[in-house]
Amino acid sequence: IAGINFSVTKHVLMLWLVAGIVFGTVTWATRRYLKQERPVPHGFMNAVEWLVQAIRDSIALPNVGSKYVKAWTPLFLTFFCFIVVANGIGLIPIFEVIGLVDYALLHSGEHSLVKRLIHGGATATANYNVTAALATITFFAIIIAGSKAHGFVQHWKNLVPSGVSKAIYPILIPIELMGMLVRPFALTMRLAANMTGGHIAILAILSFVFLFNDLFNSAAVGVGVGMMLSVPLAVGISALEIVIILVQAYVFTLLTAVFVGMAINVHH
């Protein structure tokens, strides 16, 4: 289409990879489980069952209620697994290794596919377009949940608290509509900013090597700073990133469940 670029970017490639890993892993584990004569979870399936129960009991059930828990748990599970895998793959230096191989062995041209792959970050959830797409799913899930629970028209009526004078409707309605848009915007910014911040911090710390190299005009000083300061700090932040991966996936999933639950349980 004229004016629209549909080329496959690095983040699109990573999204396909993440989707394939999540779908393939869950499908393989489920089929292996169902092929047993006595379906008893063991090994990897124990972890899958624990994750399903944890999301269902700690996130879905308290927010959407027992009536809708089966309907909405799959969405929350998909969000959590997708975000965890996307965040985790971003920590693996796949394209950095490709860059080193290219530098040492391949020596590809400036406009080659390899050069295009090694430019930019590899964490799909650090791209605001990706997190905006996830938040858009949450936005429509809220509308669908409220419409299924109360009817389409009543769902929109529920935006205004009951018992409020109609005289202040012109003030409340725009505020509530803005609130509907702020929720997915907040989800978008929170996830992308948190996943971007850690990588920026690591790059900033590793840049000390080059800064001290230029400052003292000595490669030995740069390497020394890297060994004594930059590398240990970068490793520490990378370890912290592992925690952030789980926390951000949990927070995004929890907030989605809270927003969906608010549309269903209006009295809350």
Regions found by a protein language model. Give the residues of each.
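Selective transmembrane helix interface/packing segments
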Residues: 1-268
